[in-house]
Design a protein with these regions (language model features):
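Membrane-interfacial helical/loop segments at transmembrane boundaries in membrane proteins
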Residues: 81-101
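Hydrophobic alpha-helical transmembrane segments in multi-pass membrane proteins
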Residues: 11-28, 54-83, 105-128
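Membrane-helix boundary connector in multi-pass membrane proteins
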Residues: 101-108, 133
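Membrane-interface elements of multi-pass transporters and channels
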Residues: 37-41, 72, 76-87, 139
Length: 151
């Protein structure tokens, strides 16, 4: 049976990952601070701290993969329609018409990558809240789609 202090520390570990919306890298810094200060005193806090950090690191990896897919696709799609000689030799170059017919498959993959990224961020927010509620009730929580970097 976990004490109220352990439940609170574990809950704040989950909720501290929401600081990413206020501080850059807050979703890593604050959970690490809470987890390292309490992990030796409580196995419950240790478990939840590892879950939070593994989830955040997994989301970082997934986001980097999606960005690595989406950005080159959008760059290729946009620049394949621009005549570079016209840009170099004409000061008044205006793009009149984009023809995406040749790159529709690439553009679709890029849009899907951006949509999956958005879905990851929305689900991250709700999973953090759900994990905090479960943890405050004394239940162990394991995030879905998480790679166990820290064991």
């Amino acid at each position: 049976m976990e004490t109220i202090t352990e439940k609170n520390a574990a809950t704040f570990t989950h909720l501290s990952s929401l600081t990413q919306y206020f501080f850059p890298f807050g979703n890593y810094i604050f959970p690490i601070l809470i987890w390292t200060s309490k992990k030796d005193k409580s196995e419950f806090v240790d478990h939840n701290g590892k879950q939070v950090l593994n989830f955040q690191l997994s989301l970082l990896l997934y986001s980097l993969v999606l960005i690595a897919i989406a950005i080159p696709i959008f760059i290729i799609t946009i620049f394949s329609n621009i005549p570079f000689n016209a840009i170099i030799h004409d000061d008044n170059f205006v793009i009149n018409n984009f023809n995406f017919d040749n790159n529709m498959g690439l553009l679709t993959i890029g849009i899907i990558a951006v949509l999956i990224f958005g879905l990851l961020k929305v689900s991250e927010f709700f999973l953090i809240i759900y994990a905090a509620i479960k943890t405050s009730n004394g239940e162990r929580f394991k995030y879905p789609i998480t790679i166990p970097f820290i064991k």
